[in-house]
Protein backbone atom coordinates (compact mmCIF):
# COMPACT_ATOMS: atom_id res chain seq x y z
CA UNK A 1 0.00 0.00 0.00
CA UNK A 2 1.27 3.45 -0.90
CA UNK A 3 1.63 6.30 1.53
CA UNK A 4 -0.24 9.53 0.82
CA UNK A 5 3.03 11.18 -0.27
CA UNK A 6 3.81 8.31 -2.65
CA UNK A 7 0.33 8.47 -4.16
CA UNK A 8 0.69 12.23 -4.59
CA UNK A 9 4.01 11.71 -6.34
CA UNK A 10 2.58 9.17 -8.76
CA UNK A 11 -0.54 11.26 -9.42
CA UNK A 12 1.51 14.39 -10.06
CA UNK A 13 3.90 12.52 -12.38
CA UNK A 14 0.90 11.12 -14.28
CA UNK A 15 -0.61 14.61 -14.67
CA UNK A 16 2.70 15.82 -16.07
CA UNK A 17 2.81 12.89 -18.51
CA UNK A 18 -0.65 13.81 -19.77
CA UNK A 19 0.47 17.43 -20.15
CA UNK A 20 3.41 16.31 -22.30
CA UNK A 21 1.12 14.15 -24.43
CA UNK A 22 -1.25 17.09 -25.06
CA UNK A 23 1.76 19.18 -26.10
CA UNK A 24 2.61 16.54 -28.71
CA UNK A 25 5.50 15.13 -26.71
CA UNK A 26 6.49 11.85 -25.14
CA UNK A 27 4.07 11.10 -22.26
CA UNK A 28 6.47 10.87 -19.33
CA UNK A 29 6.11 13.01 -16.22
CA UNK A 30 8.05 13.40 -13.01
CA UNK A 31 7.52 14.81 -9.51
CA UNK A 32 9.78 15.49 -6.54
CA UNK A 33 7.78 15.04 -3.33
CA UNK A 34 8.73 15.33 0.33
CA UNK A 35 7.95 12.56 2.80
CA UNK A 36 5.30 14.79 4.37
CA UNK A 37 3.50 15.21 1.03
CA UNK A 38 4.68 18.51 -0.43
CA UNK A 39 5.39 18.73 -4.15
CA UNK A 40 8.79 20.41 -4.43
CA UNK A 41 8.90 20.36 -8.23
CA UNK A 42 7.40 18.68 -11.26
CA UNK A 43 8.28 18.35 -14.91
CA UNK A 44 7.55 16.46 -18.07
CA UNK A 45 9.48 15.14 -21.03
CA UNK A 46 10.29 17.96 -23.46
CA UNK A 47 12.46 16.06 -25.93
CA UNK A 48 10.09 16.49 -28.87
CA UNK A 49 8.86 19.96 -27.96
CA UNK A 50 12.38 21.39 -27.51
CA UNK A 51 14.18 19.05 -29.93
CA UNK A 52 16.57 18.25 -27.08
CA UNK A 53 17.52 14.64 -26.42
CA UNK A 54 18.51 15.51 -22.84
CA UNK A 55 15.11 17.02 -21.91
CA UNK A 56 13.90 14.01 -19.92
CA UNK A 57 11.06 14.41 -17.41
CA UNK A 58 13.35 13.79 -14.44
CA UNK A 59 15.83 16.39 -15.70
CA UNK A 60 13.05 18.94 -16.18
CA UNK A 61 11.83 18.24 -12.64
CA UNK A 62 15.28 18.70 -11.06
CA UNK A 63 15.82 21.88 -13.08
CA UNK A 64 12.46 23.15 -11.86
CA UNK A 65 13.52 22.53 -8.26
CA UNK A 66 16.72 24.46 -8.91
CA UNK A 67 14.76 27.46 -10.20
CA UNK A 68 12.79 27.82 -6.99
CA UNK A 69 13.46 31.07 -5.18
CA UNK A 70 13.85 29.13 -1.94
CA UNK A 71 16.16 26.48 -3.44
CA UNK A 72 18.80 27.12 -0.78
CA UNK A 73 16.39 26.07 1.98
CA UNK A 74 15.63 22.69 0.43
CA UNK A 75 17.28 19.60 1.86
CA UNK A 76 16.47 16.91 -0.66
CA UNK A 77 18.89 14.04 -0.32
CA UNK A 78 16.99 11.99 2.26
CA UNK A 79 13.65 13.69 2.60
CA UNK A 80 12.28 13.54 -0.95
CA UNK A 81 11.43 10.95 -3.55
CA UNK A 82 11.55 11.40 -7.31
CA UNK A 83 8.65 9.77 -9.14
CA UNK A 84 8.40 9.18 -12.88
CA UNK A 85 5.47 7.80 -14.81
Where does each model-flagged region fall?
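Short, basic/aromatic recognition patches
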Residues: 2-23
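Residue-level signal for inorganic ion chemistry
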Residues: 13, 29, 61
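Short, basic and Ser/Thr-rich N-terminal targeting/leader segments
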Residues: 24-28, 83
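Short beta-strand scaffold segments in enzyme catalytic cores
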Residues: 28-34
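A cytosolic small-molecule/anion-sensing beta-strand core signal
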Residues: 34-35, 63
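Short, glycine-anchored, charge-dense loop/turn motifs used at functional sites
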Residues: 36-40
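Zn2+-dependent cytidine deaminase-like catalytic core
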Residues: 41-85
